[in-house]
Amino acid sequence: MKNLFISILAFFNISAIFCQINPKNIEIVRDQYGVPHIYGKTDADVAYGLAWAHREDDFKTIQEGYLAGNGVLSKHIGLKGAGADLITQVIESKETVDKLYNTLSPDFIEILQAYSQGMNKYAEEFPEKVLVKKLFPITPKKMARYSFLTLFIDNGADRLVSDIFQNNVKNDFFFSDNMNGSNAIALNSKKIGKNETFLAINPHQPFDGPTSWYEAHLISEQG
């Protein structure tokens, strides 16, 4: 019993440490292009600041991602979100995250907690921008569920689930004579008449939406 008490006490002490984010230790400076340069005393401070910058720039899209990852997108967009909600249930995102969450390092969990605090604080100060109240408060586990769904979709497994429900699964769906590819072109300096070499690639990333890239400069005094 004594060991159990000590373990519980240690858990709450660690949680308390993780939750101590002082916004005064965080500075967000945007350059002429709007790119946020985020300064903080610790990695957790910077994560909190990054969450705040994300929300300033596109709170709606980030919420939609988390709604899908937690199986409640249909509460926002109706039947159009039912497919994503169904996939989240089929792949058992919640059960998988609950099972594997404790395998994450304490340092990483601290970063997740700090980021979620930044999101929750923004939602608290701008409640009119919240899409679905049930999504909040955001927790590290809710964030991890969205990451799990993203990995599933990035590997094309969502299309397989769709084929299964439509009874349209083919034995050769992994291999095809008409497989798509991508191009990368390297331009030598001698070819372009400049003392530079260029590499043209297609990152297959859209300019907006949940899979678009985001530029930020993170500076932590922690290292």
Language model features: what each stretch is:
Residues 1-21:
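Bacterial Sec-dependent N-terminal signal peptides
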